[in-house]
Amino acid sequence: MGSKADFLASLPEQIRSPNNCWAEKLPGVPYNYGYRPSLAAGASFIVLFAFALIYHLTLSMRKKRWVSVALSYGAFVELIGWVGRTWGSQCPYNQHAYLMQIVTLIIGPVFVTAALYILLGQLIQIFGPESSMLSSRMYTIIFLTCDWVTLIIQAIGAAMAASAQRTRKNPTPGTNTMIAGIVFQLATMAVFAGLAVDFLRRISKSASSARSIGDVDGGSVPKQYYSVLTALFISLVCIVARNLFRVVELAEGWTGHLMLHERYFVALDGLLMVLAVWIFIVLDPARLVDENRDLFTRPADVERVIHKGSLEVEEAEHGGRGSYGAKEYSASQQAY
């Protein structure tokens, strides 16, 4: 008889089936979570993520925006995770509910970070190559590849850890794999944050250059784009904070203080992820950008708004030769 079968046979009859729904605490047999999950918390997060899913999914179908598609996936995965925890609140010994929430809630943020990477890549296309150290295409390829690597590592680690927990084996290999995936994601996000700050610096500098030569119209970035960047940075900070919490929580182990007290998970995972997704409902890039897209439909308009100052300064310094012309920018606009 295999070890898993031996383990199941040793369990009390009430929870021997993986599909059991025994709610009462059994003497000497801890709940899968170390506690009984809160029904109120689970139901609240189901409502919040379900609304976000419906909003972003509807937007992705209407606007055909990849940012909305990625946010839809993120909201959906988080929703499934909290459905699992709500199920676990009624059936705290149920193995399927436990596995369901462990795998989905560890990988959910990966889809939201994908939305951030796509969003900044699109902003780079709008403002032109002078606004970034990397081309928008290379930017998207590099960061989305890192995101997929993160997703695979974390999913494998979560499955390993959940399986070990379910059969009361050593979960350390799976836990360490999960930590490695989160740390890799944090490293990727640190590089992303640096490039995002550089992007903000570059577009602000271009606008300042325009003002310095008396171009009032071209001396400012439309406020809608600052709103989009505000949403991006808020979401980024939330996910970084959530990831740091999960690293500390997992490093403490499955019997650590953070792991055994649900309030930390609710505040530092659930609430932070709600904010990371909901900020794009309050400050929706598709709505803000599309409503003001007429500012960026013609190369001449783009030069007037953001590039005119930097181009004229460069022409003065290099004998009338600007480094970036309307023809090249028109090509980048068509790619958006």
Residue spans for each PLM region:
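Residues within membrane-spanning alpha-helices of integral membrane proteins
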Residues: A43-F49, L53, S68-A75, I102, ...
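Cytoplasm-facing ends of alpha-helical transmembrane segments in multi-pass membrane proteins
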Residues: A50-L57, I106-S132, W148-A162, L186-S204, ...
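Juxtamembrane membrane-water interface segments of multi-pass membrane proteins
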Residues: H56-R65, Q90-N94, L123-S136, A196-V228, ...
